[in-house]
């Protein structure tokens, strides 16, 4: 469920201050954050933000079409390793019962 428009977007204040400081100095450093729920604002465009996925920080380069989304959408937390299955040389599975 999206956030109410009268409340406005949630952006962690510390993250917002860091990006504002980088914008005033015209610097492009990687900013680490654990705030996956922060909304991407137009001021973030062009910066690389390292978003924590529970194990490590994933660098996310912010482009214009990411504005309005949350940072956590671009740092997946789960790794898919495939379904378990029998590895036979023929490539087939066990014969089915009728």
From Swiss-Prot:
The keyword RNA-binding applies. Pfam families: Ribosomal_S19. One of its GO terms (molecular function) is rRNA binding. Transmembrane segments: none annotated. Keywords: Ribonucleoprotein, Ribosomal protein, RNA-binding, rRNA-binding. Gene3D superfamilies: 30s Ribosomal Protein S19, Chain A. The keyword Ribonucleoprotein applies. PROSITE patterns: RIBOSOMAL_S19 (PS00323). InterPro entries: Ribosomal_uS19 (IPR002222), Ribosomal_uS19_bac-type (IPR005732), Ribosomal_uS19_CS (IPR020934), Ribosomal_uS19_SF (IPR023575). One of its GO terms (biological process) is ribosomal small subunit assembly. Residues 77-98 are annotated as: Disordered. One of its GO terms (cellular component) is small ribosomal subunit. It comes from the Bacteria. Belongs to the universal ribosomal protein uS19 family. Protein S19 forms a complex with S13 that binds strongly to the 16S ribosomal RNA. This is Small ribosomal subunit protein uS19.
């Amino acid at each position: 469920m999206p956030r109410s428009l009268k409340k406005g977007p949630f952006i962690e204040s510390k993250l917002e201050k860091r990006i504002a400081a980088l914008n005033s100095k015209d610097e492009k450093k990687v900013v680490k954050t654990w705030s996956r729920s922060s909304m991407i604002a137009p001021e973030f465009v062009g910066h690389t933000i390292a978003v924590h996925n529970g194990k490590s920080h994933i660098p996310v380069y912010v482009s214009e079409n990411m504005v309005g989304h949350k940072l956590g959408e671009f740092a997946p937390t789960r790794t898919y390793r495939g379904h378990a299955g029998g590895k036979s040389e023929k490539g087939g599975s066990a014969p089915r019962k009728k």
